[in-house]
Regions:
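Functional transmembrane alpha-helices
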Residues: 1-128
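Cytoplasmic/organellar membrane-interface segments at the starts of transmembrane helices
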Residues: 53-56, 108-172
Length: 172
């Protein structure tokens, strides 16, 4: 039996589809908000933004940490289920994928540090933080990232309704 034909593996894959959409969506929102205010995406020009844009900064930091699979976020749960589903069948590929998570952590933490926590740039001293509509958008995307990270059964039980019949029909 293949790794993809286990409830754990398929739940991980389905959860990854959902969580990738919310995390990446949040990253696009906050990067767009930074660009709208700073008119640049050049990281060396964006140091110290957390002091000027704390709401946008929190959105970026949480999305970045969820993207690299920080425990208590939906990114962690999805990656864990995928790894648990693939390891018994493809141990070497799972280990290689886990190394990819380490690489992702490196570039995400590098970006977060230099953009939001690095030395402040004078050109950014008057940048405004999120407006109410922006803050609501950030919060609405943060909510499922954290809720699914803390209680994944909110979605995995829903996914099982479709996953279990597929496994049964395929002889898994």
């Amino acid at each position: 039996t293949g790794a993809a034909l286990t409830p754990v593996g398929l739940n991980g894959a389905a959860l990854q589809l959902f969580t990738h959409g919310t995390i990446t969506g949040l990253l696009f929102v906050v990067v767009g908000l930074v660009y709208d205010r700073a008119h640049t995406r050049h990281i060396p020009e964006l140091g110290g933004l957390m002091r000027r844009m704390p709401i946008i900064g929190v959105g970026f930091v949480v999305a970045g940490l969820a993207s690299l699979g920080l425990p208590s976020t939906s990114g962690f749960v999805a990656e864990l289920l995928i790894f648990l589903g693939t390891f018994p069948v493809f141990a070497w590929a799972t280990a290689l994928s886990a190394f990819g998570v380490v690489l992702a952590a490196g570039y995400i933490l590098w970006t977060v540090q230099r953009t939001f926590f690095g030395p402040s740039q004078a050109r950014n001293d008057n940048l405004p933080d999120a407006k109410l509509v922006d803050a609501v958008s950030i919060a609405l995307l943060l909510l499922p990232i954290m809720a699914i990270g803390l209680y994944p059964k909110l979605l995995t039980d829903v996914f099982d309704v479709g996953i279990l019949p597929i496994i049964s029909r395929l002889g898994g």
